[in-house]
Each structure stands twice: as C-alpha cells, then as structure tokens.
Amino acid sequence: MAGSALAVRARLGVWGMRVLQTRGFGSDSSESMDSGAGSIREAGGAFGKREKAEEDRYFREKTREQLAALKKHHEDEIDHHSKEIERLQKQIERHKKKIKYLKNSEH
C-alpha cells in the first residue's frame, strides 16, 4: 500500500495527492450505494415481478442465442473436418496407386 501511494504521489505531484486525500473525507460512492439500493425489485409487488420476468426472458433469449451460435460453430467444425477427411482419403488413394504402379514397374 505504501509503495502504491508513493507511486501515485510521484505521478500526481503534491496537488494530485491533496485531491486524493480530500476525497477520503467524503462518503465513498461504493459504500453509500448498496447493491440494488432503491431498486424496484426490492420493493416487491407487481413491478418487481414484472422486472424479474423481463430479466429472466432476456437471459433465456441470450442463452438461446449462445446455444445457437455454439451449435453452428460445431456444425461448421464437423463440415470442415469431413472435408479434410475426404481430402486426406483422396491423398491416401493417390499414394496407394503410386505404390501399386511402382510394384508393377519393378517386374
């Protein structure tokens, strides 16, 4: 902590450090804002239920989109690997023909 304070002081100079020091006397914004403070959902009632339903629908839709993208990715991978298999099988056949030709030419 002392090392980081010295680094800040070196970068900001005297006036920058004074600003950092005076900010400590006020209420910290992260402490004053509770997570969800003043939110409609905490108040309960119809608005809270509606907000929760909208959030759930949003996340279900995002999940659907992500799964669709993942499915497409896997289908593309399968297609790519199938084409690669075909290409390699053609090469194997080509090499087998060369070997067969070489065996026949030896005799």
From Swiss-Prot:
Coiled coil: 60-107
Species per Swiss-Prot/TrEMBL record: Rattus norvegicus
Ranges for region Antiparallel alpha-helical coiled coil region: 74-106
Stated role: Endogenous F(1)F(o)-ATPase inhibitor limiting ATP depletion when the mitochondrial membrane potential falls below a threshold and the F(1)F(o)-ATP synthase starts hydrolyzing ATP to pump protons out of the mitochondrial matrix. Required to avoid the consumption of cellular ATP when the F(1)F(o)-ATP synthase enzyme acts as an ATP hydrolase. Indirectly acts as a regulator of heme synthesis in erythroid tissues: regulates heme synthesis by modulating the mitochondrial pH and redox potential, allowing FECH to efficiently catalyze the incorporation of iron into protoporphyrin IX to produce heme.
Gene that produces this protein: Atp5if1
Transit peptide: 1-25
Region (N-terminal inhibitory region): 26-52
Listed name of the protein: ATPase inhibitor, mitochondrial
A GO term for molecular function: ATPase binding
Predominant place of localization: mitochondrion
Region (Disordered): 25-58
